[in-house]
């Protein structure tokens, strides 16, 4: 049975669990609940690992316990040991707005230390879900990504993480096709650009449940 790997990046320890840098872990935790599988620690790979069958594939879900900057130390040996056909990495991205999602295969790490670590071990030949967290005007990058999502962002997270879950499922169901077809499909149907709230929406503190039903998400194909 062909094997796939979905890896979410983050830092272990409870103090990091709600931080922007841990969005990869958050998506995998949501998948665990929705798809009814459990994570268990695998000492061989220094990672939390879960697995289920989706269609013709065995799909592994992995949360490295190495800390972000050493993510490749867990992912690379896992990919080699199980002869993984395709790897899909979910990570935070400060270069796109909060909640925006983009997909790519290969290419630059964009300065993300978790991706740098993976690339140093196995190159850049893997799929990526770039989950936008935006930037801060007041905090440096490290302080910002290691801080918790704010209250307004937390209201939106559940719907956004659910969208990311659907993208993961689509990847798993299409994994038998050439990587170019998989990437085009993800970019066309799951790329997300969140309309920014107007000042009145922000002042009125509208719930995301209401906003979600009204928003017209803009999907676009990356060049």
UniProtKB/Swiss-Prot annotation:
It is found in: Cytoplasm. It is an enzyme of class 3 (hydrolase). Its EC number is 3.1.1.29. One of its GO terms (cellular component) is cytoplasm. Its main location: cytoplasm. InterPro entries: Pept_tRNA_hydro (IPR001328), Pept_tRNA_hydro_CS (IPR018171), Pept_tRNA_hydro_sf (IPR036416). The keyword rRNA-binding does not apply. The record marks 92 as: Stabilizes the basic form of H active site to accept a proton. Keywords: Cytoplasm, Hydrolase, RNA-binding, tRNA-binding. The record marks 11 as: Discriminates between blocked and unblocked aminoacyl-tRNA. It catalyses: an N-acyl-L-alpha-aminoacyl-tRNA + H2O = an N-acyl-L-amino acid + a tRNA + H(+). Gene3D superfamilies: Peptidyl-tRNA hydrolase. It comes from the Bacteria. One of its GO terms (biological process) is rescue of stalled ribosome. TRNA binds at residues 16, 67, 69, 113. The active site is at residue 21. The keyword Cytoplasm applies. One of its GO terms (molecular function) is tRNA binding. HAMAP family: Pept_tRNA_hydro_bact. Hydrolyzes ribosome-free peptidyl-tRNAs (with 1 or more amino acids incorporated), which drop off the ribosome during protein synthesis, or as a result of ribosome stalling. Monomer. Belongs to the PTH family. This is Peptidyl-tRNA hydrolase. The gene is pth.
């Amino acid at each position: 049975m062909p094997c796939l790997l979905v890896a979410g990046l983050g830092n272990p320890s409870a103090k990091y669990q709600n931080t922007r840098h841990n969005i990869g872990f958050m998506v995998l935790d949501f998948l665990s609940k929705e798809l009814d599988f459990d994570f268990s620690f695998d000492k061989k790979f220094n990672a939390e690992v879960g697995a289920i069958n989706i269609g013709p594939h065995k799909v592994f879900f992995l949360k490295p316990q190495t800390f972000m900057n050493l993510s490749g130390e867990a992912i690379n040996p896992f990919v080699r040991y199980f002869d993984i056909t395709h790897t899909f990495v979910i990570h935070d991205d400060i270069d796109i707005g909060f909640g925006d999602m983009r997909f790519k295969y290969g290419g630059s790490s964009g300065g993300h230390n978790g991706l740098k670590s993976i690339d140093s071990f196995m190159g850049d030949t893997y799929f990526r879900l770039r989950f936008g967290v935006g930037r801060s005007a007041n905090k440096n990058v490290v302080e910002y990504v290691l801080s918790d999502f704010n209250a307004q962002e937390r209201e939106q997270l559940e719907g956004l993480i659910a969208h990311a879950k659907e993208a993961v499922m689509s990847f798993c169901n299409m994994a038998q096709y050439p990587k170019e077809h998989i990437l085009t499909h993800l970019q066309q149907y799951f790329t997300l650009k969140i309309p920014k709230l107007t000042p009145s929406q922000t002042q009125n503190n509208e719930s995301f449940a209401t906003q979600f039903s009204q928003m017209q998400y803009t999907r676009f194909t990356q060049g």
